[in-house]
Amino acid sequence: MFAFPVTLLLIGVLALIFASEMWLQVQYYGWAEAISPQILVDLGANYPPALLAGEYWRLLTSCFLHVSFLHLLMNSYALYLFGPMVERNFGRGKLIQTFLVTGMLGSLATNVLHRSDGGYISAGASGAIFGLFGVIFFAGKYHAKRLPKELQSWLNQNMLLLVGMSFAPQIDKWGHFGGLAAGLLLGWSYVSQHRGSAPPLTGEVKRSEDSHE
């Protein structure tokens, strides 16, 4: 894992920010499994009324906040799975770029496509996680003929799992799909930049059933 410092750094940043959320939660509202909506809004969650007031920075800051420890744990584990593959194959800069760009576009998709009265609150790195997987998936399909069958199967299984879980209750599916679409486009861009010189997608494959418990 220490061979992938940017992935480790991102996981550490998410953990530190959540620790700050929990500290504020305990200080002002008492212990709870989920962070208070007011704290999430105050710290920069995706909140349409605030965005309409010009607080566009929430499209980014919301990607670093999490609603509960389980929420953080799931996204951190997904980052542990997908981050090193992007970092190994495309570089540290591309990993940071992918995380930030797809996370923001996922947040934007939520605001554009979410059908509600606009009073919802959205937070989490899921859009960025889906973006990272989008890059991996596109690169894998581009190099499909040169990929081991195990890796091809891993990509397909995770795509089905990620899309399927997006329809669960209380899940921001538009943020997921917005991040995924942005990741696929970035994957196309990255592969195009290295066409003819890039090696096949490589990476340690984790069993899909271990990816989403």
Where are these regions (language model features)?
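A detector for small-residue-rich transmembrane helices and their helix-helix packing motifs
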Residues: 1-212
